Amino acid sequence: ATYTLPEPPYDYAAL
């Protein structure tokens, strides 16, 4: 993902 999110698996939510 290309957004600043918490640790994975949240990275997939950064669509």
Swiss-Prot record:
<keyword id="KW-0479">Metal-binding</keyword>
<keyword id="KW-0560">Oxidoreductase</keyword>
<comment type="similarity">
    <text>Belongs to the iron/manganese superoxide dismutase family.</text>
</comment>
<protein>
    <recommendedName>
        <fullName>Superoxide dismutase [Fe-Zn]</fullName>
        <ecNumber>1.15.1.1</ecNumber>
    </recommendedName>
</protein>
<dbReference type="GO" id="GO:0046872">
    <property type="term" value="F:metal ion binding"/>
</dbReference>
<keyword id="KW-0862">Zinc</keyword>
<comment type="function">
    <text>Destroys superoxide anion radicals which are normally produced within the cells and which are toxic to biological systems.</text>
</comment>
<keyword id="KW-0408">Iron</keyword>
<comment type="subunit">
    <text>Tetramer.</text>
</comment>
<dbReference type="GO" id="GO:0004784">
    <property type="term" value="F:superoxide dismutase activity"/>
</dbReference>
